[in-house]
Structure formats: structure tokens, C-alpha cells
Amino acid sequence: MIRTGMLALGLLFALPAQAAEQRVYLVATMQLDGSSLAQSVFLHEPDITDLDGCREAVREGQRARDWQKYHHIFRSDRFKGFSGHMQYRCALSELEFSMWRDGPRYNRSYLIGVDEDEMLSAQRTPSQAQCMAQLRALSPSQQAQSLCAMSNQDLTP
């Protein structure tokens, strides 16, 4: 009896101490109108722990035009002669991204998806062209939930 209990206890400790933690992300995407060109940032605020909190922070940021949470800057001065629009999407993910810093090097291509359960997926692709090929290979319903975008953040292991 004691052996069985010890074995069960040993197996319990052999399991990972904790499943990967789901983080709440704000995926902010600037899409250049009339094209497939987009830039995305993956923003995480440790004190926002649910999707409703994320959506409220987006409403407040858009209303006040002062992002107290998920602080970011849309550099419209870099897009003179072009029009674009911002899309904000709150999502959950076990992925971890490096911190976003405003900078010129949006040179990492990602296939990004947010499914009907608001789960974020992001897959690094070698190029924007290869990302578009992967996007076109998805089912129509998956295509509607996905996009290709450039980012200056890395996925961290």
C-alpha cells in the first residue's frame, strides 16, 4: 500500500509542474488598404488576465487616443500617400513574443490566425511570399481568420 502511494506520488511530481500559461494578447495590425501588406505587433499586459479586460483597454485606448494599456504608436507619417487601417483583436495564446519596441525593422514574416474561440496562432515564415502561399492553401474558413503580416518581434522558446 505504501509502495503504491509512493509510486503515485512520484508520478505526480514527474508531470510538468504547470501547464503552459495562457496569456492575453492584443494583436494590433496596420493593413495597407488595397494590398496584402500588413504589420502586426503582439502586445501583452501582465495585469490584464482576461479577454474582457483586453477589449475594455482597446475601447478606452481608441476613445481617448491615449493607450494607457497596450501602449503603441501608429506612425502615419511613414505612410504618406497611402491609406491604411488599424485592426485590433484580443486573443489568448500560450505563445510568448519578445517585447515590442517601435523601430524600423519589421522583417519577420508571420502567418497569424485568431480562431472562433479567440485563440491566437502565429507561425514564422521565411518570407511574405511563402506566407501568402501558405495562407492560400488554408480552407476558406481558416483564410477568413488568418493573415500574413510583418513584425519586429520574435517568438521566444
Residue ranges and their predicted role:
Residues 1-6:
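Bacterial N-terminal signal peptides that target proteins for export
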Residues 14-17:
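N-terminal signal peptide c-region/cleavage motif recognized by signal peptidases
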Residues 20-157:
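Mitochondrial intermembrane space
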